[in-house]
């Protein structure tokens, strides 16, 4: 058994970690209270290639695939998806946020800006490049807005100040550059 990911809420009251067993890429996510160390929710299972991005203490975003038919070790997985897990609810009620047919053969990762106003998703190609999508979490019916498309560059947003995102990219910059979006 090995630790794959560890993530704390901003308040540090809760933390979640993922473990892998037997060298598998498939993980389990376990959520605990930092004061009591007691597990506070069911274990999330069948999670693959995922981070853990907390939204307050309400819940967190994570990535996975549909559970494959057949062997977990040899089945093809090609439609990565981002879900939101609300604390206190079963994994079967997790909300699909993005992914599926529109992102075939892509690795999706979700993270939030420091103030948790924006959900940022990177859709990475299997070889080079990524697309960036951003959703304003303060607007009830907000849709994802494409910031970079085409998988022709690798870009990562590292800071959001007010309504400006700052990113590092190699788009038209082989040695990379910082841009404001």
Question: Which residue stretches match the model-derived regions?
Answer:
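Beta-propeller folds
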Residues: 1-181
């Amino acid at each position: 058994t090995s630790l794959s990911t560890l993530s704390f809420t901003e308040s540090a009251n809760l933390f979640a970690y993922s473990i892998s067993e037997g060298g598998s890429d498939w993980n389990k996510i376990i959520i605990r209270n930092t004061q009591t160390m007691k597990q506070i929710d069911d274990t999330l299972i069948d999670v693959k290639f995922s981070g853990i991005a907390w939204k307050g203490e309400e819940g967190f975003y994570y990535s996975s695939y549909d559970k494959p038919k057949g062997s977990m070790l040899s089945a093809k997985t090609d439609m990565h998806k981002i879900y939101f897990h609300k604390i206190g609810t079963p994994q079967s009620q997790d909300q699909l946020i993005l992914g599926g047919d529109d992102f075939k053969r892509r690795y999706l990762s979700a993270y939030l800006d420091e103030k948790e106003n924006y959900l940022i998703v990177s859709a990475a190609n299997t070889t080079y490049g990524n697309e960036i999508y951003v959703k304003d979490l303060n607007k009830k019916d907000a849709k994802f807005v494409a910031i970079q498309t085409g998988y022709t560059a690798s870009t990562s947003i590292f800071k959001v100040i007010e309504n400006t995102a700052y990113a590092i990219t190699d788009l038209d910059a082989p040695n990379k550059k910082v841009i404001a979006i």
